Amino acid sequence: MKDLLKFLKAQSKTEEFDGIKIGLASPDMIRSWSFGEVKKPETINYRTFKPERDGLFCARIFGPVKDYECLCGKYKRLKHRGVICEKCGVEVTQTKVRRERMGHIELASPVAHIWFLKSLPSRIGLLLDMTLRDIERVLYFESFVVVDAGMTSLERSQMLTEEQYLDALEEYGDEFDAKMGAEAILALLRAQDLEHEIATMREELSQTNSETKRKKTTKRLKLMESFLQSGNKPEWMIMTVLPVLPPDLRPLVPLDGGRFATSDLNDLYRRVINRNNRLKRLLDLAAPDIIVRNEKRMLQEAVDALLDNGRRGRAITGSNKRPLKSLADMIKGKQGRFRQNLLGKRVDYSGRSVITVGPTLRLHQCGLPKKMALELFKPFIYGKLETRGLATTIKAAKKMVEREEAVVWDILDEVIREHPVMLNRAPTLHRLGIQAFEPILIEGKAIQLHPLVCSAFNADFDGDQMAVHLPLTLEAQLEARALMMSTNNILSPASGEPIIVPSQDVVLGLYYMTRSCVGAKGEGMVLSGAKEAEKIYRAGLASLHARVKCRITEYVKNEAGELVPKIELKNTTVGRAILSLILPKGMEYALIDPPLPMTEAGKAELAEHPERWIKYVSNQAMGKKQISKVLNTCYRKQGLKDTVIFADQLMYTGFHYAALSGSSVGIDDMVIPDAKKDIIAAAEAEVAEIQEQFQSGLVTAGERYNKVIDIWASANERVSKAMMENLSKETRQNSLGEDEVQASFNSVFMMADSGARGSAAQIRQLAGMRGLMAKPDGSIIETPIVANFREGLNVLQYFISTHGARKGLADTALKTANSGYLTRRLVDVAQDVVITELDCGTSEGLWMTPLIEGGDVVEPLRERVLGRVVAEDVLKPGTEDVLVARNTLLDEQWCNTLERNSVDRVKVRSAIACESDFGICAHCYGRDLARGHLVNNGEATGVIAAQSIGEPGTQLTMRTFHIGGAASRAAAESSASVKNTGVIKLQNAKSVENSAGKLVITSRSSELTIMDELGRTKESHKLPYGSVLEVKDGQAVKAGEIVANWDPHTHPIITEVAGRIQFENMIEGITITRQTDELTGLSSIVVLDVNERTTTGKELRPTVKLVDANGKDVLIPGTDVAAQYFLPGQAIVQLEDGAQVNVGDAVARIPQASSGTKDITGGLPRVADLFEARQPKEPAILAEISGTISFGKETKGKRRLVITPTDGGDAHEEMIPKWRNLNVFEGEKVQQGEVLADGPESAHDILRLRGISPVANYIVNEVQDVYRLQGVKINDKHIEVIVRQMLRKCEIVNPGDSDLLEGEQADVVRVKIANRKLVAEGKQPATFRRVLMGITKASLNTESFISAASFQETTRVLTEAAVSGKVDDLRGLKENVIVGRLIPAGTGFAYHHGRLEKRRQAAKAVVPVTQQATADEAEQNLADLLNAADNLNA
């Protein structure tokens, strides 16, 4: 028996493999797979349910229906294993062979494989250089094709209609050979000499100049080369033998009532066999040509339907009018093999139930219903029962468990001890959607969840359900405990901030207990310590909010690093003192009670009246943000364990005091301000006035509408301001008898103020006014809802507000689907980015500066570089001293150092610049955000990045924003004023000084920045061309000063030299007209548009030249170019010919069409556009090269822009539509990549003209803008990881000595590796330029065809892979999941490394492989063993 077991173990050993190759199957290969030919369309006998012989379920071909039993029943039982029954021909073996044995059908006529025919581009068409239409006409018997022209004037693969064929037959007889149907295509493919074709095509490529021809030839060449290299033969794309799927994979199940449920494939196979057999008969009978042709065409259609139903013509439908599911449908789509069964499986040892709240649990625990636990832990219980000797067999143990005997519960308790379970809440949007907990057995049927982990799961208790999974093996339990335990996941992997943060009740409780109240019971007491504070509160001698003096003990680290107590008398409140009891040792008291900064006046008052200290107690209560900050500080200072305990204590305390506070909301809590009536009345009066003006024709309809909306918007603001002031403050008398203003104890206000629930905007709707509402099309209705919810809405108001509510619901549904799809694309593109090495050694990276918009620092440098590795030494500003050495990980301490030394730009390592071949290195990635140290090898950073970007997707909006009304008017600014005091610094600004001694800006992208005394950038303002500066570079300014002015409505042309004006080609009535202003009486010259001019004026170009007193041209300083300014159409000149001008004067002005309401694409669609690298509609036009601008000959709708390079290379020309507003003038110098015409910039242009860093910065900043608007924090590095994946392809510019083709797209890594090899051999490496690819395209273009096929467009990916005989090396995560291996990341990283090492060792020492026994030998051995065993028994 032992031998037998050993033998069975050896049988089930799987082959080790390192890769999977896909290719075309030759007819011989198909026959070698097959166990026999299927000749009949019959399936099973309806009476006996036995499979018919030679049919689709034949037992002789596919194996026995019952284990170890032949069909006729002559041989039964294991001992006859391997015998072939002489009566029914069935081999006696296991029935599972019916899942793996294939059959085949010998086709009477060859048939084209529809994938290689119809999947675009058609592979057969490309190879034969025929159009798909022509090939289809041949295949479906509509025309002939010449296969062999012989000595005739016909050409090979020439199409002939029926008549032409007959004519040719008459003319040439059997000199030539023409056929129709798949035979013809087969003959053509066989006749192709690939090597010869490739040689001629390479010849052609080197000679041709036509772009289209080159593209087409390159495509054909690549296809032929891939055929040649892969060993596939082109004629295998035409099938002569059809494989038949094993029957158990296309089951036929009898239902009750004599009907059968069957897989659609059986119907499809039946049609093929029927038609094939009929065709064979017809051919034997030598039937007329037309009949045979029709039958062949039907066979072709039947095989098409079997392989991919509906790909050509109408889909074949079953009895119930729905299309049959073909082989291709089996594997593609959400319900296909890949996504349904390989990537997402259902799991054993799992259960699900509703969740309820478990406020008494510890952070690492969850409550598990006893019933569930008993079911999940069954095998463990059976095992324990047996080892204890309480049950003799498994069966007995099973009985005991079913009876639920008392001892079973005791054993369950033991089994469950320290055995973590995993809880999962769908949708699992990020890795915190599955966490491990220790189960606590509870009565009832609901799982209890710890309140603090709800935000990670995004769970609430309104009926949410969660699934429980049980890690079985020791390794699984270890991973669950060490990596997935809720206590090990305190920080969010997206931003590195705590995700275990109290919310709602807990926040309210903590806020309530840390509030101070004027004149509360016990005010002014002096207490001996926090314990006493708790005593007097419990005894009812003092209120929780009473302001008292209390001795607080803090623990501070001394020189030796030990904690020593430090006792201090502090002005605080009773509640804060009590809260300090749960603070971990080593945390400062100031975190929960920040001391008030003392002013001089305050100190003087206290010296005079010491009893007034009660007025100097901080009135800052702890809100949600503050609590989060405390937890974060605790984690960084005290470590994980203390933080977890502290978080739990905070929660218990919060719940306790929230209950004691008795906070509740009544209708009287929503106090409506008295000023509301007056504000609304005033607004209505203003609206009436505007209406009158409109009726008397003073304002246009559009202006009136905008005005009205403005009026109501500001009225709404005023009402809500009045309401908040009214609600948030109250006056009370303190113990000294003085009145003090304090924050109100109104419940609604407290909830919003603490961050527990609600916001000012919601309170505004409850107690202010609801305000303006939008119509379904997005436009704003001009009559607002003046009522609020407390007053109640009337019918009209209610109806108006339903629009928004309904749109919100529809949006949410759309948003969820869109967001999920974005996450899926992101995961797919980044799935194989894993940390593979410690340091790739690059010194490249990104420059990080604080993000500043106008006067506000949006994101300080500290937040941008925290957790990054420095790429170049950071020098102390103004010196050469190294402050931070290269390759240092910037943690909180280093960031403090940077801030102290006021560094404002740092070059950090980035995933985009990482030089690792596969994956990225730890230094380029930096800190693992969820753990707070340098990232470990094998961390799946790509998936984490994708989850971090995709998870908040549902919070983003779906809509396009319209800026209208107030916002659009605010946009037309005419000056810049500073918010901070500091020193002016101009960035890339060219300027001239005008006669008044002020600087006039003459460059496009100038910025004015304000530096503080330490040299840090505080704010920055963009200065348009022609702005007049009120200050000089380096001048000190005070906050609120105006630093620059400009005219927002016109675009000036500034002269850079002084001189006299001379007009050229300015002819009145032909190129210009004069206009006189009615109000001022001043006349000005207006240049006519080209299309307004007469024919004589079309060619003329109105110009203003500057000449000196002698009439000579004045040159632009520093060049030998004459100062002349060409005037575009509509330009206004207010000077006369011969007038004198100074430097910095405007010679002309171009009126700017007021940029109307621009639509800003926001939210999810914007993020998707960025990651898909879509071209914007009208992108900004960038300068292709650096040089001088001039304008060439104009065409009807476009003007010709010419850039002449300064170094004398070839000029670059470009046609630009007339209506585009150009930012440049003739003769201006531009740098490559500068904006010539405004518009949304295209990421592709930025990459091409400015390089990789700018495009990375652009995408990162644009994506961050969208998320920042919603208040979502995501670390930049996640977006960088995705951008790295978008940049992984390149276009070959010059192939050098490599075997790449010019213009071909290839993986950057592959090219780099090939180049290294070429350089080592002393050959010419290939040159390339990087290409930006959208995430969908990048996913489909991965190295791994398994990963691409399981993403989208399965058919196309597999067709392409098969033709080129691709090998999948199983490098990424998806491929390994699909073949059922550990993924090469996380704990599987070491396993894969070990396998690699083993392979390397094996390659070094090649040993003769011991031949494995063939199946037949193995069966023979087993039969011998069994017989021996039987003999022994006998």
UniProtKB/Swiss-Prot annotation:
- Which reactions are catalysed by this chain? RNA(n) + a ribonucleoside 5'-triphosphate = RNA(n+1) + diphosphate
Q: List this protein's GO terms for biological process.
A: DNA-templated transcription
Pfam families per the UniProt record, alphabetical: RNA_pol_Rpb1_1, RNA_pol_Rpb1_2, RNA_pol_Rpb1_3, RNA_pol_Rpb1_4, RNA_pol_Rpb1_5
Alphabetically sorted, this entry's keywords are: DNA-directed RNA polymerase, Magnesium, Metal-binding, Nucleotidyltransferase, Transcription, Transferase, Zinc
**Where along this sequence does the record place binding of Zn(2+) 1?**
C70, C72, C85, C88
Q: Which residues hold Mg(2+)?
A: D460, D462, D464
> SUPFAM superfamilies from the xrefs?
beta and beta-prime subunits of DNA dependent RNA-polymerase
Q: Which residues cross the membrane?
A: none
EC number assigned by the record: 2.7.7.6
Q: Which SMART domains match?
A: RPOLA_N
Instruction: List the cofactors.
Output: Mg(2+); Zn(2+)
Q: Which GO terms describe its molecular function?
A: DNA binding; DNA-directed RNA polymerase activity; magnesium ion binding; zinc ion binding
Group of enzyme by EC: transferase
The note on the cofactor says: Binds 1 Mg(2+) ion per subunit. Binds 2 Zn(2+) ions per subunit.
Q: Name one GO cellular component term.
A: DNA-directed RNA polymerase complex
What exactly does this protein do?
DNA-dependent RNA polymerase catalyzes the transcription of DNA into RNA using the four ribonucleoside triphosphates as substrates.
Q: How does it assemble?
A: The RNAP catalytic core consists of 2 alpha, 1 beta, 1 beta' and 1 omega subunit. When a sigma factor is associated with the core the holoenzyme is formed, which can initiate transcription.
Q: What is this protein called?
A: DNA-directed RNA polymerase subunit beta'
